[in-house]
């Protein structure tokens, strides 16, 4: 019985994946190749845009502890969600 209980505890810990960090895209619009990073300081991926010139919009991507306070930030909390 103790062995079964210990097995269930181990399986639960493995399935819950304690210490999970989210993976976010960190590439800006004009950077190649696409890069990903483990977001260790937080659990939010973000994407927002800025206008460099009237004809060029730059999209910024990254990860943060909480959603940045900007007017048009899109935040999400699943892996690679900030396309």
UniProtKB/Swiss-Prot annotation:
CDD domains: TFP_snake_toxin. The keyword Signal applies. Its main location: secreted. Residues 1-21 form the signal peptide. It is found in: Secreted. One of its GO terms (molecular function) is toxin activity. This is Short neurotoxin homolog. Keywords: Disulfide bond, Secreted, Signal, Toxin. Disulfide bonds join 24-45, 39-63, 67-75, 76-81. It comes from Bungarus multicinctus (Many-banded krait). Belongs to the three-finger toxin family. Short-chain subfamily. Orphan group VII sub-subfamily. Pfam families: Toxin_cobra-type. Expressed by the venom gland. GO terms for cellular component: extracellular region. The keyword Disulfide bond applies. It comes from the Eukaryota. InterPro entries: Snake_3FTx, Snake_toxin-like_sf, Toxin_cobra-type.
């Amino acid at each position: 019985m103790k062995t079964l209980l210990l097995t269930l505890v181990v399986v639960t810990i493995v399935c819950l994946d304690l210490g999970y960090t989210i993976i976010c895209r960190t590439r800006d619009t004009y950077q190649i190749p696409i890069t990903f990073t483990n977001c260790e300081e937080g659990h939010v991926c973000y994407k927002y845009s800025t206008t460099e010139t009237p004809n060029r919009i730059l999209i910024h991507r990254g990860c943060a502890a909480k959603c940045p306070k900007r007017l048009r930030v899109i935040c999400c909390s699943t892996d690679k969600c900030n396309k």
